[in-house]
Amino acid sequence: MSRGLGDVYKRQELMCELREKMGTAIMLITHDMGVVAETADDVLVLYAGKAVEYGSIEDIFERPKHPYTQGLLNSIPRLDEDVELLNTIEGTVPAPDAMPAGCRFAPRCPYGKDRCMKEKPGVYHAGNSLVSCFRYEGEKE
């Protein structure tokens, strides 16, 4: 293990120990889904500063609902596969002064519709998760 990875692992262990000892929560903001998988109980996924999905660590990793969450998890390289190119999410994050009127992910979304570009989605129940996506508008708890 390289020095840098060892330091990260030690800090991660320390955070978990402190959480247990003090009976507190930890808010961890990161793109490192490996750290999230090892540390978190619940996950709030943000895209361009907006919450798009909330659920347990199991639901987020095993049954992601929001297209951004799905794309994010699909972009993680697998250790059991040899690939030349990593999976990516098409497009780019909009500039802060050029956000779409509707869903911020709509221009990059494989399921995006005109409605998504024009209207902001509410928050809907999808299984045990909460998701901000019109695809789950009609689902029941």
Name each model-derived stretch.
Residues 57-141:
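Short catalytic/signature loops enriched in Gly
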